[in-house]
């Protein structure tokens, strides 16, 4: 199965070289960096490092993910941040359950292992717990982490009819996938503070607060969502 990695990036020229160099070629077929209105050399650096660059000028995490999704034809889509806080060598941990037919959506959790939890700031952990609990009430899926490192079948993402264009994208994906009765799996992933640049969410209290508020609104909005029946061709 063709695996495509989509990396939304806003002013990540410092982190991208190390991140892109660490992506295992044997596990990935293509890498797309979505330049989300950067004011630095993000696009130039990404292209120089061999990634395909897509531009999305509407600043928003979901908007960047959507632009990357539309630009690729991969059968498995992996989303990860461009700040080197996650480890590309673990991409196969996310894609393997999908390839083996064990899952449709695999979430990378930074809080399943005690050794990784402390790398996540307290305010981010508290926000994760609150949002994850409300998602559990709404969808009967109880995620331990709302992190962005995840893999999903393309055919599933197409059916989710994603609408959120900001930080609500990860929450919307989980809620809708659960209502489609998708097989959702969490796997532990390693995490570290960003290596360069400025944190927009987890490493920034105001960013975490803003993201959590956005996710809470998303839970309220999509908790009653009903999936459309799959289209069928007429005889």
What kind of region is each of these model predictions?
Residues 2-4, 30, 172:
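Cell-envelope/extracellular polymer assembly enzymes that use nucleotide-activated donors
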Residues 7-18, 37:
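Active-site beta-to-alpha loop of glycosyltransferases that engages the nucleotide-sugar donor
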Residues 21-29:
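Short, acidic, metal-binding catalytic loop of nucleotide-sugar glycosyltransferases
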Residues 35-43:
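A conserved acidic beta->alpha catalytic loop
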Residues 36, 80-82:
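Active-site acidic Asp-centered loop
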Residues 57-59, 63-71, 89-167, 194-216, ...:
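Acceptor/aglycone-binding surface of glycosyltransferases and processive sugar-polymer synthases
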Residues 77:
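Short aromatic/hydrophobic "clamp" motif used to bind/position activated sugar donors
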Residues 141, 165, 174-192:
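Catalytic donor-sugar/metal-binding loop of nucleotide-sugar-dependent glycosyltransferases
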């Amino acid at each position: 199965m063709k695996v495509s990695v989509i990396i939304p990036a806003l002013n990540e020229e410092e982190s991208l070289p190390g991140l892109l160099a660490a992506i295992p070629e044997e596990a990935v077929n293509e890498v797309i960096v979505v330049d989300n209105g950067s004011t630095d050399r993000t696009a130039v650096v990404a292209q120089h490092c061999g990634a395909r660059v897509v531009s999305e000028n509407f600043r928003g995490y979901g908007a960047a993910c959507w632009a990357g999704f539309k630009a690729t034809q991969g059968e498995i889509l992996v989303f990860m941040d461009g700040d080197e806080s996650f480890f590309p060598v673990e991409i196969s941990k996310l894609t393997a359950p999908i390839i083996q037919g064990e899952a449709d959506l695999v979430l990378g959790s930074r809080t399943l292992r005690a050794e990784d939890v402390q790398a996540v700031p307290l305010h981010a952990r508290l926000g994760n717990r609150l949002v994850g609990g409300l998602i559990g009430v709404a969808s009967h899926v109880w995620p331990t982490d709302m992190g962005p490192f995840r893999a999903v079948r393309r055919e599933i993402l197409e059916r989710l009819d994603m609408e959120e264009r900001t930080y609500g994208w990860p929450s919307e994906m989980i809620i809708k996938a659960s209502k489609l009765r998708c097989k959702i799996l969490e796997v532990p992933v390693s995490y570290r503070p960003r290596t360069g640049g400025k944190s927009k969410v987890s490493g920034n209290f105001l960013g975490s607060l803003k993201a959590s508020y956005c996710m809470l609104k998303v839970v309220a909005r999509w908790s009653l969502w009903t999936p459309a029946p799959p289209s069928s061709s007429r005889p």
